[in-house]
Amino acid sequence: MLRSNAITQGIQRSPNRAMLRAVGFDDNDFNKPIIGIANGHSTITPCNMGLMDLANRAESALKEAGAMPQTFGTITVSDGISMGTEGMKYSLVSREVIADSIETACNAQSMDGVLAIGGCDKNMPGAMLSMARMNIPSIFVYGGTIKPGKLDGCDLTVVSSFEAVGQLASGKIDKDRLIAVEKNAIPGPGSCGGMFTANTMSAAIETMGFSLPFSSTMAAVDDEKAESAAESAQVLVNAVKNNIRPLDLLTKEAFENAISVIMAVGGSTNSVLHLLAIARTAGVDLTIDDFERIRQTVPVICDLKPSGKYVTVDLHKAGGIPQVMKLLLDAGMLHGECKTIEGKTIKEVLRDIPSKPKENQDVIRQISNPIYKKGHLAILKGNLASEGSVAKISGVKTPVLTGPARVFESEEECLTAILDNKVKAGDVVVVRYEGPVGGPGMREMLSPTSAIVGQGLGEKVALITDGRFSGGSYGLVVGHVAPEAAVGGTIGLVEEGDSITVDANKLLIQLNVEERELARRKQKWEKPKPRYKTGILGKYSRLVSSSSQGATTDQI
């Protein structure tokens, strides 16, 4: 029986049907499944500016497949545009708003399934959280990646522009060059083009079976992207008929598959936060330690930006996520029996994918010839992060540094010091009170990390924070430090000049201060007053969980 029968069947539902007739239903439509289209279209960001065409294609395809589509809007924010500002505090919050809005619309209207369309970073995990909560047949359509910008024959991404700021500050380029990069970095619609957060999460969603094979690496402007939206609609209608639900797919093994692919492609630190949140919502026992366990056995085999050479459209040409998955499957690093929204197993989906990467390309390598022998997202613990932290060590030859702490109470303070050349080789930069509660909202530190890299200090300076990093960040960066400063974490006790050790080889993040001294500082520490007492940020800071649990707000 259809869930939507609650609003379409029986004499008592005559007023409900009257409303539905006004939006296009007729006598023959009340026995059809009602499918929601959660449309994240927006012109505030290139990531989402092309989604309306995909929604229209999906709507037509749903009708052709015998369903009744109902389109509703959900929000997005632009991480790239809000980066480095107070507005960035709303980015992670938007993940919860997206999840809440999709859940609200679908459950209020008794929809039988949902096709969610998104582009910017939080669209993907937001949609997945709602799907796990509702457990109705669901599919995700990614808006697609942007094609690279070009300047002097070189590929550009949005990170190129952030790094140019640091290069200008250190005298490596002039202002004309910075403006040239600015004008060429973002050529049109699509999500940021490297293996940054949006492309990482779309890859994870494809791996877990919630979007169609190859669809997570398609370019936003290519015809195949619109065709995949139409095909996704047909697949979803079949899933409704066959009662294939999200919790059937969201198993521990599916999450392990997603982590393996994220390691293999060199994906974003944000994936740790988002997968923990989705797993918690789905009732799956996934912990931050699972990421470290899998990292030890899965190599990085894709040479992708931010630390590598290529962009996501290059990965697509080289075989996309299915090619990566096939290599992992053959190496025993993937669970082949996990189900997809199509009703097939992963092994069945990958049956016709070649067992070797394509020749004449070096985007995807053999397992035996990796970029890095182990995954690039290391989970560090120690007295500075007893619940754990996430280090992204791709692009770093020696992921070990002991140095003096340079302590900043906000991202703005930190960036000013970097651009004024006050951060030197060997320093350990600490940015605190930027966590889920303290920020609130865990701002991403792309501006400081890009400035450090732009000044040539990416190998020589460590940056640790209870906030987050953009998928575009690389270097010796450690985020998601938990417990965070605002709830009494040790990061809040660090003083200027303290010795800190970051050692990714030993999985250690340690404040080299005697326990007696730390106890004295802890006794003197006072919980800061909340930066926001009202509005969504005030509400968020009161509800949000630790980053080690995914920073969710709905489990009280």
Swiss-Prot record:
Its cofactor is [2Fe-2S] cluster; Mg(2+). [2Fe-2S] cluster binds at C47, C120, C192. It is an enzyme of class 4 (lyase). Binds 1 [2Fe-2S] cluster per subunit. This cluster acts as a Lewis acid cofactor. InterPro entries: DHAD_IlvD/Edd, Dihydro-acid_dehy_C, DihydroxyA_deHydtase, DiOHA_6PGluconate_deHydtase_CS, ILV_EDD_C, ILV_EDD_N, IlvD/EDD_N. One of its GO terms (biological process) is isoleucine biosynthetic process. The active site is at S470. SUPFAM superfamilies: IlvD/EDD N-terminal domain-like (SSF143975), LeuD/IlvD-like (SSF52016). One of its GO terms (molecular function) is magnesium ion binding. Pathway: Amino-acid biosynthesis; L-isoleucine biosynthesis; L-isoleucine from 2-oxobutanoate: step 3/4; Amino-acid biosynthesis; L-valine biosynthesis; L-valine from pyruvate: step 3/4. Its EC number is 4.2.1.9. It catalyses: (2R)-2,3-dihydroxy-3-methylbutanoate = 3-methyl-2-oxobutanoate + H2O; (2R,3R)-2,3-dihydroxy-3-methylpentanoate = (S)-3-methyl-2-oxopentanoate + H2O. Functions in the biosynthesis of branched-chain amino acids. Catalyzes the dehydration of (2R,3R)-2,3-dihydroxy-3-methylpentanoate (2,3-dihydroxy-3-methylvalerate) into 2-oxo-3-methylpentanoate (2-oxo-3-methylvalerate) and of (2R)-2,3-dihydroxy-3-methylbutanoate (2,3-dihydroxyisovalerate) into 2-oxo-3-methylbutanoate (2-oxoisovalerate), the penultimate precursor to L-isoleucine and L-valine, respectively. Homodimer. This is Dihydroxy-acid dehydratase. It comes from Prochlorococcus marinus (strain NATL2A). The gene is ilvD.
